[in-house]
């Protein structure tokens, strides 16, 4: 299945996964920029989210990167739509708290994390099976890992 066909499939877990990829990039870039401002703690939190999301959204990385069995077990918890919606909601909530101090660019990461969480929640509520994008190492590769 090509990338265009994946998007036409109307499977919200595919939309959530690609929004998650955008979150990885935003989380790293904005987190790095925020480390050099007065949002140091939240910038570091955002930087930590980036590799965590990378391992969640690109399942092939668990196969090729040397990680501990505890970390692998933690990442494998997020193989269902409900669990992915939960982790995205928690991450988004963590960055929404940064607004208590002052509005910053971290809100962009929080918004995209919330959107990805909503896509996964919609997929779960519509009882769509979790489908990993073929481009990101899914469809066969993801099944070997889990």
From Swiss-Prot:
The chain crosses the membrane at residues 16-36, 39-59, 82-101, 106-125. GO terms for biological process: vesicle-mediated transport. InterPro entries: TVP18/Ca-channel_flower. GO terms for cellular component: Golgi membrane. It is found in: Golgi apparatus membrane. SMART domains: Cg6151-P (SM01077). Its main location: Golgi. Keywords: Glycoprotein, Golgi apparatus, Membrane, Transmembrane, Transmembrane helix. Golgi membrane protein involved in vesicular trafficking. Belongs to the TVP18 family. This is Golgi apparatus membrane protein TVP18. It comes from Coccidioides immitis (strain RS).
């Amino acid at each position: 299945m090509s990338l265009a066909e994946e998007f036409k499939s109307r499977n919200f877990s595919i939309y959530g996964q690609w929004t998650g990829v955008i979150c990885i990039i935003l989380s790293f870039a904005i987190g790095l920029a925020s480390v050099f401002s007065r949002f140091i703690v939240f910038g570091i939190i955002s930087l930590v989210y980036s590799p965590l999301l990378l391992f969640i959204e690109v399942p092939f990385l668990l196969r090729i990167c040397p990680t501990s069995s505890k970390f692998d077990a933690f990442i494998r918890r997020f193989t269902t739509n409900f669990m992915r919606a939960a982790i995205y909601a928690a991450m988004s909530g963590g960055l929404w708290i940064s607004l208590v101090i002052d509005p910053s660019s971290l809100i962009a990461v929080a918004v995209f994390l919330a959107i990805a969480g909503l896509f996964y929640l919609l997929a779960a509520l519509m009882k769509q099976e979790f489908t990993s994008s073929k481009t990101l190492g899914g469809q066969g590769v993801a099944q070997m890992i889990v």
